[in-house]
Amino acid sequence: MIYTMKKVHALWVSICLMLNLAPAPLNADSEEDEEYTIITDTELPPLKLMHSFCAFKPDDGPCKAIMKRFFFNIFTRQCEEFIYGGCGGNQNRFESMEECKKVCTRDNVHRIIQTALQQEKPDFCFLEEDPGICRGYITRYFYNNQSKQCERFKYGGCLGNMNNFETLEECKNTCEDGLNGFQVDNYGTQLNAVNNSQTPQSTKVPSFFEFHGPSWCLAPADRGLCRANENRFYYNSVIGKCRPFKYSGCGGNENNFTSKRECLRACKKGFIQRISKGGLIKTKRKRKKQRVKIAYEEVFVKNM
């Protein structure tokens, strides 16, 4: 009798277990299908970065400090926090979320367009063409700093740099000589009393400077991470001159020189001056009345 009751009890337990487990595969399949559908239906616009280094993975460096920093994540398309060791690493590292967004997010482009001076070319116009890492075959335009013209190239479809325009007109308005598209909304004009024509007001940086040096000379001055206060020089590509700054003693970038002469030797190569009338381009030549320029030109030619 006891054996029969145990057998019946075991049978009912088996039936209950079968009923509870039977729907599980169906639910699992439906959940997988639902999750798959969500993934495939999600489409994001092509990612176009302002700088290629914004695509670098976060690098905490070889040191062991614990410092809160931010990097741009190309997968989430957002600036995120990571722990930095205090030395080394790469350029995709920012001290604040705001700085990260300002440098790497596309939303900041409109702000740059509205505030850039009319006679200045943006720094990214001097960057070389960069097709990116993808394998697309998209026609785009870039500004060639050697030919001084906008030219066509094939873009892979992702990453690259900001010297990348969808139309030839957009490229010309932004980077070629003359009045480019980077205008301040309230930018005024003044009437020329001689020819009764409107001419732009003078800007803080003359438009007749052209830069042809190494690409890393375009980097801004970087004080670094330590607490020293060393006198160094960096090349300011906007005005074409080497300027002093205070270096902390570690970190920073390659645009960092112990002397002004060393800075000029590295970054002044190919620096030319364009005559404003007629748009002609020529290098500086020796003139008897300009002894200072002669001495400078001798050094310049020697280091070519």
Curated annotation (Swiss-Prot):
UniProt xrefs under InterPro entries: Kunitz_BPTI, Kunitz_BPTI_sf, Prtase_inh_Kunz-CS, TFPI-like, TFPI/VKTCI-like
Q: Which domain of life is it from?
A: Eukaryota
Tell me which Pfam families the record gives: Kunitz_BPTI
Chief localisation class: secreted
Q: Which residues are glycosylated?
A: 145, 195, 256
- Range of residues in the leader sequence: 1-28
Q: Does the keyword Disulfide bond apply?
A: yes
Instruction: Please list the GO biological process terms of this entry.
Output: blood coagulation
Q: Where is this site: Reactive bond?
A: 64-65, 135-136, 227-228
What this chain does, per the entry, is described as: Inhibits factor X (X(a)) directly and, in a Xa-dependent way, inhibits VIIa/tissue factor activity, presumably by forming a quaternary Xa/LACI/VIIa/TF complex. It possesses an antithrombotic action and also the ability to associate with lipoproteins in plasma.
Q: Which named protein is this? A: Tissue factor pathway inhibitor
